[in-house]
A protein has these predicted regions:
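Mid-domain, small-residue-enriched loop/turn segments at the edges of structured enzyme/sensor domains
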Residues: 59-60, 149-205
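Conserved catalytic neighborhood of penicillin-recognizing serine enzymes
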Residues: 112-148, 155
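Active-site SXXK
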Residues: 78-107, 269
Length: 299
């Protein structure tokens, strides 16, 4: 709560001149260009986000949609890292009946990795698909994410699902932990803030999943144990947040969320970031402060 208040206070006095949001667009189609009879209008420049890039020495991508939209490097590619896990769970849900979640998946010690905090406890018994979804989405367990991909038929099958969802940008090529290498210029395992954010918007707020499946995924995202210092730290107190984080090399820190501010319509916030050196540290305050700006602008 202290972190949230500090972040929101930082932006309470920030002027909005030159930073107004652009009109809202439907969740099921790409945002239309604003045009005249001959040329497209110049995109709105969000000076506050440019200043955050300077302050944190980072590249920052933002796509937010509510009563309006905010776009900053919204169509640039970033490594998505663990944010794929919510999408993988959605693909498993989409392709199978809810009863399939009771299927037990077995694995071995060889499948474990550093981030296998939950799956490490169940090597002898295996885990039900519903529990793997929980471990992957709520705890960002790497082995659980990989096992969801395995259940789909591999990374390419997740990409195929996203194409069916209407996402022509996000691509899944590898598995954990390779996806966290986040090498600049490598298109593998990348997305844009717009594409990734729109995916989550369709899954959580749209009809991409049947109601029971949507509710199951939304509940996992709302009860995530990661990201307390990211988007959740930048929203108004009392907001409900359904989010998935991702972290990798080159200071990569991401958070994708649907936020329900008290008494307001939901806002989709997709924030992705990276730095220039492989061993660079990420700073979650960058995401929290970018979130505070987004909320201040769109509410």
């Amino acid at each position: 709560v202290t972190a949230r208040r500090a972040v929101l206070k930082t932006f309470a006095l920030l002027p909005l001149a030159g930073c107004a949001a652009t009109p809202a667009t439907p969740t099921t189609t790409p945002p239309p260009a604003t045009t005249t009879t001959t040329t497209s209008a110049a995109p709105v420049k969000h000076d506050a986000l440019v200043e955050l890039e300077k302050k944190f020495d980072a590249r920052l991508g933002v796509y937010a949609a509510g009563v309006g939209t905010i776009e900053h490097r919204a169509d640039e590619r970033f490594a998505f890292c663990s944010t794929f896990k919510g999408l993988a769970a959605a693909a498993v849900l989409h392709r199978n009946p809810m009863t399939h979640l009771d299927t037990v998946v077995t694995y071995t010690e060889a499948d474990l990795m550093k981030s296998s905090t939950i799956t490490r406890q169940h090597v002898q018994t295996g885990m039900k698909l519903r529990d793997l979804c929980d471990a992957a989405v709520r705890h960002s367990d790497g082995t659980a994410g990989n096992l969801l991909l395995r259940a789909l038929g591999g990374p390419a099958e997740l990409t195929r699902y996203l194409r069916d969802l209407g996402d022509d940008e996000t691509r899944m090529d590898r598995v954990e932990p390779d996806i966290t290498s986040a090498t600049p210029g490598d298109p593998r395992d990348t997305a844009t803030p717009r594409s990734l954010g729109t995916d989550y918007q369709r899954l959580v707020l749209g009809d991409a999943l049947e109601p029971a499946k949507r509710d199951f995924l939304k509940d996992l995202l709302e009860r995530s144990v990661t990201g307390a210092k990211r988007i959740r730290a930048g929203v108004p107190q009392g907001s409900k947040v359904a989010s998935k984080t991702g972290t990798g090399s080159y200071g990569t820190a991401n958070d994708i969320a649907v936020v329900w501010p008290p008494g307001r319509e939901p806002i989709l916030i997709a924030i992705m970031s990276s730095r220039s050196s492989a061993d660079a540290k990420y700073d979650e305050a960058l995401i929290a402060e970018a979130t505070a700006y987004v909320v201040k602008t769109l509410i």
